[in-house]
């Protein structure tokens, strides 16, 4: 499982040319180039030009990516909006990638969460693991959702943290050219079995509906005054069930 996870991370970094790490000015204009952009990119960039020829052990790979992961998590904490100034700070999430091609995997933090769950269960007996498997217990999601990478060409516009409508720029200038902005969106599946209501809800007593909810991510945008800068914008990030009680019965 460890080797599989590392393989997924390697492929993830292979397609990623750059990733936004810091927010110089949430609402401000700032530089077009994202501040402190890091390219962890390939094994060569992490371990030196001869890394590919001399090979790496599983242990050294694990140590390297553990260090990268710690940096990502530390930076993620630094760029979160001040909760005193932003009521929706708890809705912040990172689902943006700058790349020259469509990413092949979900965001890295999603893979980390799955790997963490695996590590938490690593010491359990086979019997416990077998009974804890959601598929074996017949667990189903209350609402059916779909997740996919979309580009700024698909989004066009978005709402920022001040409530204004901004234009989402499709490409971001970097030192060696331009990269596209990709957003990993999750929304309710219009073709799913829960389009008429949430799964498992007693319809005799409750009205239910699956709704797409949004969170904030950082993106390069342009406001109505043609000012370009990095801002927090809303994108679709989950599908939740809302309930209202039936009255008059």
UniProtKB/Swiss-Prot annotation:
**What pairs make up the disulfide bonds?**
143-210, 188-239, 198-241
Propeptide-annotated positions? 19-130
What SUPFAM superfamilies does the annotation carry?
Cystine-knot cytokines
Main localization of the protein described in the UniProt heading: secreted
Q: Give residue numbers for the site Cleavage.
A: 59-60
In the record, biological process GO terms are:
axon extension; axon guidance; axon target recognition; behavioral fear response; behavioral response to cocaine; cell surface receptor protein tyrosine kinase signaling pathway; cellular response to nerve growth factor stimulus; cellular response to norepinephrine stimulus
Would you indicate the residue range of the signal peptide? 1-18
| Positions glycosylated per UniProt | 123
Alphabetical keyword list: Cleavage on pair of basic residues, Disulfide bond, Glycoprotein, Growth factor, Secreted, Signal
- Show the GO cellular component annotation of the record: axon; cytoplasm; cytoplasmic vesicle; dendrite; extracellular region; extracellular space; glutamatergic synapse; hippocampal mossy fiber to CA3 synapse
Purpose: Important signaling molecule that activates signaling cascades downstream of NTRK2. During development, promotes the survival and differentiation of selected neuronal populations of the peripheral and central nervous systems. Participates in axonal growth, pathfinding and in the modulation of dendritic growth and morphology. Major regulator of synaptic transmission and plasticity at adult synapses in many regions of the CNS.
What is the protein name given in its UniProt record?
Neurotrophic factor BDNF precursor form
List the source organism: Rattus norvegicus (Rat)
